[in-house]
Amino acid sequence: YLMGRELEVDGVFDGEDILIPGIMEHVERSGIHSGDSISVYPPLHISEEHKKTILEDTKNMARELGVVGLINAQYILYNDEIYVIEVNPRSSRTIPYISKVTGVPIVEVATRVILGEKLKDMEFGTGLYPEASYYAVKMPVFSFEKLTDVDIAMGPEMKSTGECLGIAKTYPQALLKAFKGANMKVPKKGGRI
């Protein structure tokens, strides 16, 4: 187990080039299932150097795994080092989220790649897609009030039953919208959520 900041990417690899629409940063501590984590795009706490490392590492893993199409990778940033914690040569639950918030139709792009097109010949380019000028927060939704025998402690097993999305010009506004979308009561002053 590594403490640190968890990061996640979805990408498309065509055998030569990769397109990563965006890097998502998890808000909670590492070790929480990614489906149960609050996630923010664009990431708040990583350097351009770390973004380049994630881009190159994801590209290299896709090449070594023989991926043509979608890839999902999860990382931890700990003591200024990037560590791979999981890589999946497939789609993930974050594909609709990152597609919506970046405007990159990832499934369509991956399908075109699988059918033989090259990323460099498409309108979205290669590498890390330019970041948006707004923030998007993916918020898990839980049903603990209906599933009363479920342990509510967060860990590596997913417990959420849905997700919602908050989008705004600032991170605090996007986070507030996401909390409201998940029907969480947010105090106007002080308190805890």
Name what the model sees in each region:
Residues 1-191:
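ATP-dependent carboxylate activation and anion-phosphoryl transfer catalytic cores
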